[in-house]
Amino acid sequence: MHHPLPPDDTLYDQVRPILWTGHFLKLLDQRKLPFVVEYVECHSSEDVTQAIRALIVRGAPAIGIVAGWGAVLAAREIEAVDGIEALRKLEPALQRLHAARPTAVNLAWVLARMRRTLSAAHADWRQAMAREAESIAREDLTANRCMGAYGAALIPIGSGVLTHCNTGSLATAGFGTALGVIRAGIAQGRIARVFAGETRPWLQGARLTVWELQQDGIDVTLIADSAAAHLMKSGQVQWVIVGADRICANGDAANKIGTYQLAITARHHGVKFMVVASAATVDMDTTAGEAIEIEQRDPEELLGVSGVRTVAEGIAAWNPVFDVTPGALIDAIVTERGVIQSPDAAQMRATFGN
């Protein structure tokens, strides 16, 4: 633990996975972490689409930010006199970007923003798109710092926390959502212990979260996903803090597979459960979790580790990437607009409209 408390929590935020050079996009290849730190260059919208699909970039906010730059790159491949004509010509590329990861509502939200920008733009439509992409990234970082402060305020001094998947700088423009709350809680001296689940099958916790925290000098203990209940029973954890890829109008939240079972386990052991995500992740048009499209990935991902097969030939595997945690199991939803405790449809409506 770092006890000299920094006056500025930027000390705990050193990683940046998305770099726009002005000409092309550089993405930290998250498939190769933690042992290889390598950036992949994207020179076209198709490069960006493939990077999203291949999990070179992941995390709902980061996917949205990258899609914005993908739209900017697509704009270089067409000619148009104004934004309306450009939008008509760009629509196929925008739809391909959206199809790369359909569960992440941020992706659709960013593409909708780019469409609105184009609809209002004149001859300078390319510059308008670039300004919008920059704004999306800047707003995300600002929102994350805001969420960090709101979420940390809920955590008593001396608490232990458990997180799942990766919700930090690697998944956002910087600082992170759930990991941003943890960063803020560490900086304020509220959090005494941090645990991270490995997050099979892509091991985002083991490969990414613990590496990211290590870069920032934050002590973290890795656990097997299957050890979470025993950890909670031991009394070392007071809060589970996770992100979300989509939050419904009733407070249900879709997040990385394994989140739902953590919420059930937390409720049984009297451990609080916090979901941290930007307001862009809230989808008031989706009334409940049952309506969310759950992405299924290649079953082969479950049959080995880092390309080495560990399962006998001929075995079937089921590989949903997300699950849905009912709002009734969530103690707090934290966005940049504030905290919703014990979320339900009425509270969600009061905060997010519709």
From Swiss-Prot:
Keywords assigned: Amino-acid biosynthesis, Isomerase, Methionine biosynthesis
A GO term for molecular function: S-methyl-5-thioribose-1-phosphate isomerase activity
Binding-site residues, substrate: R58, G59, A60, R101, Q204, N255, K256
Enzyme class (EC, first level): isomerase
GO BP, sorted A to Z: L-methionine salvage from methylthioadenosine
Entry EC no(s): 5.3.1.23
Pathway of action: Amino-acid biosynthesis; L-methionine biosynthesis via salvage pathway; L-methionine from S-methyl-5-thio-alpha-D-ribose 1-phosphate: step 1/6
Site (Transition state stabilizer) residue list: C165
Active-site residue numbers: D245
Catalytic activity: 5-(methylsulfanyl)-alpha-D-ribose 1-phosphate = 5-(methylsulfanyl)-D-ribulose 1-phosphate
Family: Belongs to the eIF-2B alpha/beta/delta subunits family. MtnA subfamily.
NCBIfam families in the record: eIF-2B_rel (TIGR00524), PRK05720.1 (NF004326), salvage_mtnA (TIGR00512)
Primary role: Catalyzes the interconversion of methylthioribose-1-phosphate (MTR-1-P) into methylthioribulose-1-phosphate (MTRu-1-P).
Official protein name in the record: Methylthioribose-1-phosphate isomerase
Provenance organism: Xylella fastidiosa (strain 9a5c)
Taxon lineage: Bacteria, Pseudomonadati, Pseudomonadota, Gammaproteobacteria, Lysobacterales
